[in-house]
Amino acid sequence: MGLRYDVIVVGLGHAGSEAALACARMGLATLGLTLKRERSAVLSCNPAVGGTAKGHLVRELDALGGEMGRAADQVGTHFKTLNASKGPAVQASRLLCDRDAYAVGMQAVLFSQPNLTVREGEVAALVAGGGRVEGVVLGDGTQVSASAVLLTTGTFLQALMHVGEQKEVGGRLGDDAARGLSESLRALGFTLGRFKTGTPARLARASIDWDALEPQPGDTRVRPFSWRTKVEGEGGMPFPRQPSVTCALTETTPRTHAVLRDNLHRSPLYQGDIVGRGPRYCPSLEDKVVRFASRERHQVFLEPEGPTSPLVYPAGLSTSLPADVQLTFLHTIRGLEQVEVVRFGYAVEYDYAPPTQLKATLETKAIAGLYFAGQLNGTSGYEEAAFQGLWAGINAALQLKGEPPLLPGRDEAHGAVLVDDLVTKGVDEPFRMFTSRSEHRLKLREGNADLRLARHGHRVGLLPREALERVEARGRAVTEEVARLKRTGLAARLRRPEVTYAQLGEGREDWPVLSPDVAEEVEVEVKYEGYVAQAARAAAREAESTDRWRIPEGYCFHEVRGLSSEAVEKLTAHRPGTVGQARRIPGLTPAAVSLLLVALKRGTEAPAVCAQPED
């Protein structure tokens, strides 16, 4: 082979960008291959970063030395803390971005990174020999050799787009598909499956009746994702840096649903044209109308794609219905009666590789030096993809440098839970991360991501000494203040739900002056300490005992109080004989297993045999 690199990264979406940057920053000669340079790191669907559990992943990624958090901070236009009325463990940051500016910023980082070469090209085949990857062959016949190859192909493998009866090859509107790589993977012995995703129409901002809608302003107190943004702020650089935008809330109507039901026969989803399973937590509108037939309305959030962008993203209206049907149902929604569509919604089917074919490092079991990350592993979401890309990139680089892998435990990071669930349980639908998937979720909070993971980022060379020292200083400040509160008896008062750390210090001249993030972490540490310890003991007991708890044949899972419809569906389909078997069902959360175990111990919440057939 003529060209030679240490690492080749195939695909430069969110997973590929993080993987390529990690390898290059760790000193390896890295080639990033993409179908179009100008489409690298694009926010393909919603123009936002973060969200429930996703915000946790972004902060963890940043603590390890990743790029997504900083890139989002630079172009944020609408900041929101989700679950703000709930406990700190489930509170999550979501940042609406200037879509175009995000891609421009990430591309500037990629294209200027030392040790990283970005080149356009389609990988037609992998080259392997003796159980080890050797490189790739491009569509034009060019051969490139490498010691490691990372596949981060997103939704592009054998991708097919659907709008009503129309089909077009491509992984994203305006982009082609990766046509030959699936066959190459199969030839090497890999199993592939088929998933689908979708996106809503993009609306003309000027054609929306904003006065008829309910405004949804962002939070006035905003916290950046990245430690680097904080440092830059201390140096005088303002934050936020983009003008803010106000989103708006509307909803579908019975008329909307009637239009959808009358046209289901034109939906590729219900015609049988789409065989891939779609994401449970981001269903198409037509799917929602069928699955939740009794609901008369579904919320729709209208999100401008930038301060000056003419486009609006209607969250909640993903669809693959024909263009004429899309326009008709849009006009039945308040505020959208005269809306103009700039680009219609569509669905994408694509190949994925079941992730049980991977090691914990995301290296494939069959071919040494070959790594999979992102939607190729059956996940959905920018943040899940980015974290996997960083994880795979770090571990590929460490392997080539002869160093031990980076494998934080499930009690250290939501990202570790994500990877562990993927490689041990696999997926039967596009995987989305939730805090409930972690048995240690009380200690895995957004606010302490740096305290948990910064040492790992520094160890692998992605987090500079300055950043680690800042984190260590913050950690010491938290530890010392918690110890002082315990020593003086004030911790007992702070544990009361109605008492805050600020209230404890009122009128006390000797009260220490702490930064807001330190004071907040002190309060959370004190209030959560008992619960965290209790949860850890419960998790240990549960892990030891679950295989001993048998589930009666014909057990009515839908009678178990608190179980989600997803959990009931999975339990009913798999019919586990023990709680231990239930724990190993793909996608079943530790929270659901705990609820099931409690019900079985009580023996009163569900009859052993269902009185009526389950749906």
Swiss-Prot record:
FAD binds at residues 11-16. GO terms for cellular component: cytosol. It is found in: Cytoplasm. NAD(+) binds at residues 278-292. It holds the Pfam family SAM_GIDA_C. Gene3D superfamilies: FAD/NAD(P)-binding domain (3.50.50.60), GidA associated domain, C-terminal subdomain (1.10.150.570), tRNA uridine 5-carboxymethylaminomethyl modification enzyme MnmG/GidA (1.10.10.1800). GO terms for molecular function: flavin adenine dinucleotide binding. Its cofactor is FAD. Keywords: Cytoplasm, FAD, Flavoprotein, NAD, tRNA processing. The keyword Cytoplasm applies. One of its GO terms (biological process) is tRNA methylation. The keyword Amino-acid biosynthesis does not apply. Its main location: cytoplasm. Belongs to the MnmG family. NAD-binding protein involved in the addition of a carboxymethylaminomethyl (cmnm) group at the wobble position (U34) of certain tRNAs, forming tRNA-cmnm(5)s(2)U34. Homodimer. Heterotetramer of two MnmE and two MnmG subunits. This is tRNA uridine 5-carboxymethylaminomethyl modification enzyme MnmG. It comes from Myxococcus xanthus (strain DK1622). The lineage of its organism: Bacteria, Pseudomonadati, Myxococcota, Myxococcia, Myxococcales. The gene is mnmG.
